[in-house]
Amino acid sequence: MGRTLANKQDIVTELKGLVDEAQMAFVVDYQGLTVAEITDLRNRLEASNSVCKVTKNTLMRRAIADADDWQPLTELLKGTNAFVLVKDDPGSAIKAYQAFQKDTKKTELRGGLLEGRLLSSDELKAIGDLPSKEVLIAQIAGAINGVATKLAVGIKEVPNSLARGIKAVSEQTDA
């Protein structure tokens, strides 16, 4: 038995809510995956605050119909698609998918959308290679701390150099 119109409308409403919350989306060809493998993918993505939805392309097309930023995604709505909607950290979601793909070797990354721009699978992989937000913050903090340390050492060195110069001059006059 097929889905009723009310059921489809509920799915579209749910997808609209997820799209509104999402910062990014990417599309995966899930053909050949078992239910257990899709569940595994969903569990891995949950840690990065992402949702994996397997739905008809027509329902996703209707969910993004009113959102202009999401229109480029319609180019990817062909075939058997799973939609990964990322709420917070795109890098960690892509890394979670790449780890899953490495383990199963059954899926294909078709492309994605970030800030209204369609991304190829290579561009998505490049985003996955970037360090996480926490690592970037730590690197910036370390760089700032390093500059402050060098500045403090430099300021401290001025009186020390002056003292050594005075001592050298006094030793020359004594000799």
Curated annotation (Swiss-Prot):
Keywords carried by this UniProt record: Ribonucleoprotein, Ribosomal protein, RNA-binding, rRNA-binding
Cellular component, GO annotation: large ribosomal subunit
GO biological process: translation
GO molecular function terms listed in the Swiss-Prot or TrEMBL record: large ribosomal subunit rRNA binding; structural constituent of ribosome
Transmembrane segments: none
Domain of life of the native organism: Bacteria
Stretch forming the signal peptide: none
Protein's job: Forms part of the ribosomal stalk, playing a central role in the interaction of the ribosome with GTP-bound translation factors.
UniProt-listed HAMAP family: Ribosomal_uL10
Quaternary structure annotation from Swiss-Prot or TrEMBL: Part of the ribosomal stalk of the 50S ribosomal subunit. The N-terminus interacts with L11 and the large rRNA to form the base of the stalk. The C-terminus forms an elongated spine to which L12 dimers bind in a sequential fashion forming a multimeric L10(L12)X complex.
Entry's family note: Belongs to the universal ribosomal protein uL10 family.
Official protein name in the record: Large ribosomal subunit protein uL10
Gene that encodes the chain: rplJ
